Amino acid sequence: MAAVRPRRTALRPGPRAAVTAGAAALLAATSVWTFGSVSGAEAATTLTVAKDGSGQYTTVQAAVDAIPAGNTARVVVSIAPGTYRGLVKIPAGKQNVTLQGSGAGRSDTVLVYDNASGTRKPDGSGTYGTSGSATVAAEADGFQARNLTISNDFDEAAHQDMSALQAVALRTAADKVFLDSVIVTGDQDTLLLDTASKAAPGRVHMKNSSVVGNVDFIFGRATAVIDTSVITLKKRWDGSSAGYVTAPSTAAGRKGFLITGSTVTGDVSASSFHLGRPWHAGGDATLDPMATFRNSTLGAAVKSAPWTDMSGFSWKDDRFAEYKNTGPGSGAASSDRPQLTDAQAADQETADWLAGWTPSAS
């Protein structure tokens, strides 16, 4: 039987390569066929990014841009260790994209930028706004991020003349989002877990990860599970300790944030942080924000009355609860500290949030 032996390395868009075949495999006399690769990433399952030019692309956005519109097959963007300063957006038409650091640890590959809500756009069309400030914005279903850091390093101290200091590191506005072994770090509004619209689904599963911030730094209307992760409380720009972990904006009848098997900690003052407050985005009274912290370890920074009001909306009118938390920041059931019953807790498990979706690395 004749053999056809292609070149062992993957073709990049553009180059040509030779394939040698045994004579018995050919009907014509020639023994070398020449092939050209297609442009873009139609046939690719993995695209490589490296700052030094050793990959197919030198920026993450260039790799994302190479994925064809309408893509539904999984495409892994493998990113070599290094710090990549720039914005990354995965638009709605490019489903099932994975951003994956190829280093030994999640701190080795860093995607970072420094826009804030009040940062003016270069074209003079206004400011970015909170959602537009994101370093990485994922708007396509099936988005995954793994083994990397996503950061917004906006310098609040240097911009106290700016009125809108919210600075998002990662924004997701999609369904079936899987964040595995990532660090998402910033100050105010670090992690925006959202949906494409008020009526759209937006399931998120975050595990083995770390989220760092100080004010409303896990927020949005997604149905999100944060599991086996570390939530790190960070001091404000002036060195003070005060903040809020979550600000859910859940639609009525939907599930909001479930933090389970995780740790809330940080080098901040005792009794200085709330676990959450209700964000009725745009003053929408029809929303029913929801956050549950369960089976987690709460550090001493957590206030004894861990929930508080926001913009005239009382947390007691929405859905905030705990279940079997431990640590110096935990506390017994009281009017300030609603605890789920065992029966209620049985309906607030990860599987209830994911509703038939089983995230898997791919």
List the predicted regions and their residue ranges.
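N-terminal export and membrane-targeting signals
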Residues: 2-24
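Acidic/proline-rich low-complexity IDRs
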Residues: 10, 25-26, 46, 353
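Residues at secondary-structure transition points
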Residues: 13-14, 27-28, 88
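Gram-negative bacterial Sec-dependent N-terminal signal peptides
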Residues: 20-34
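C-terminal region of N-terminal signal peptides and the immediate post-cleavage residues
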Residues: 30-45
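Sequence-level preference for short, compositionally simple segments enriched
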Residues: 44-362
